[in-house]
UniProtKB/Swiss-Prot annotation:
EC annotation from Swiss-Prot or TrEMBL: 6.3.4.2
Gene Ontology molecular function: ATP binding; CTP synthase activity; glutaminase activity; identical protein binding; metal ion binding
Chain residues that bind ATP: S13, L14, G15, K16, G17, V18, D70
InterPro entries xref list: Class_I_gatase-like (IPR029062), CTP_synthase (IPR004468), CTP_synthase_N (IPR017456), GATASE (IPR017926), GATase1_CTP_Synthase (IPR033828), P-loop_NTPase (IPR027417)
Record's catalysed reaction(s): UTP + L-glutamine + ATP + H2O = CTP + L-glutamate + ADP + phosphate + 2 H(+); L-glutamine + H2O = L-glutamate + NH4(+); UTP + NH4(+) + ATP = CTP + ADP + phosphate + 2 H(+)
Species lineage: Bacteria, Thermotogati, Deinococcota, Deinococci, Deinococcales
Name recorded for this polypeptide: CTP synthase
Region feature Amidoligase domain, mapped onto this chain: 1-266
Protein task: Catalyzes the ATP-dependent amination of UTP to CTP with either L-glutamine or ammonia as the source of nitrogen. Regulates intracellular CTP levels through interactions with the four ribonucleotide triphosphates.
Amino acid sequence: MKYIFVTGGVVSSLGKGVASASLGALLRARGYKVTAVKIDPYINIDAGTMRPYEHGECFVTASGAETDLDIGNYERFLDLDIPAGSNITTGQVYQEVIRKERAGDYLSQTVQVIPHVTDEIKRRIRAAGESAGAEIVLIEVGGTVGDIESLPFLEAIRQFRFDEGDDNVLYLHLTLVPYLGTSNEFKTKPTQHSVAALRSYGISPDIVMVRSKDKLPAEITRKIAAFTSVRENRVFSSYDVEHVYQVPLALEEQGLGKAVEELLGLEGTHPRLGVWTDAVRTIKHPKQQVTIAIAGKYTAMPDAYLSLMESLTHAGIANDARVNIKWVNAEQLAEAGAGELEGQFADVDGILVPGGFGIRGIEGKVKAAEYARTHGVPYLGICLGMQIAVIEYARHVAGIEDANSAEFDEYAKNKVIDLMPEQLEVAGMGGTMRLGDWPMELRAGTKIAELYGVPQGGTVKERHRHRYEVNPAYVEQLEAAGLTISGVTPGVEGRGAGLVETVEIADHPFFVALQAHPEFKSRPMRPSPPFAGFVKAALEHQQQ
């Protein structure tokens, strides 16, 4: 296997994930088997218990791992399911080292950062590549060079070149070149200092990639090359573009794929990037556009809904449309009257209620679902958004006026949403939900079955992340009131026909909700069926 390590300097949030994923896309387009690893130096075991406002969304893999959002970027850009073990944290590493010490695996040894912690880091990186059957492993080291948390990881990746040989290891360093408008110039000093800091840890970058507002002039590229001792044709400009899916094409135009092949001793191949070119063309020059309202509580931090936004983009590509997002703060909707609701939703073509946890903003989300139902506006509910749809329908159609969820009121009389029985004895928070791929058996003749291309009914898999479910005791009453239970996970103890996975309203233009998170499986060239159908319905609604 060959290894490409991506580090960052100057400031955080430069876009190492997008840069790494874009390079992976270029290598995949050349026919190489590629996988990706994200290293997060925090002490948490995973991203499952972090605040979305601080860390962005928690991306769930097929195996049920709760990971950093960059794993989602890798899956979308590489069009692959990233295997378990590909998000490495300090917490995981130290937990395993301490477990081994207690088990006697290091008997008679003094357990230290070097070699025990660094060896565990290297073992995990190699294992991730082997489990994916990869020829090339991309490893993004989170944080910024100089962070104290990153030191063991930098030492471990330094050792890789000694262990694996020069032709099998490549170091790419991403930095920032700010532009000062007052003096009308790009400033390279931060990049020079960042590369010097990286070298102080024994790592000399083979490639320097520079984030900047605009493409760097040739003289700035030459200056960076001279001061960092990196060849000029190995200094690349990662400048701002209209959409992230332009990044692979922009980097390929500069020769990044070819440079990587040369440095790793790979035979030069011609990339097949036609699908990327077509997708970018549609994104930049769509034939039509729609506006979708997302009624959530993390609207001030769009990264909390990153996969949702990308799924809407993918659905837009499939429908040759630009999808404009209108963020609606669900907390503010809670006290809104009819006039205010009309003001929020009159100009939108669809309403989406995303997943989430906790009571904050819930009544506002219920009002959003009610507006969509009563005004014939296309509605897509995701995870909590499905539970909201059920609560709203129970209250206003099925006559269960005090319907609620046990999550919001554990003493509610009519808990149409309840804690799953399997969760009753669960004590811990981390990694204990119903996670990862689960089968959904779709009923023949339903909208959801049509969307997934199985109109006669069939089983599909989607990813999940939840503790609560539709209470099976209310299914018969809800169905009698006209709510269609269109998909279930069969064979779940105590659930009768099955655990409710999807609901819809038959006489509504498009009212579909899923317990699953289909956004986690959506790809630029393979959009999620519910999202593609939702955007199509929004376009049709727009024409009315």
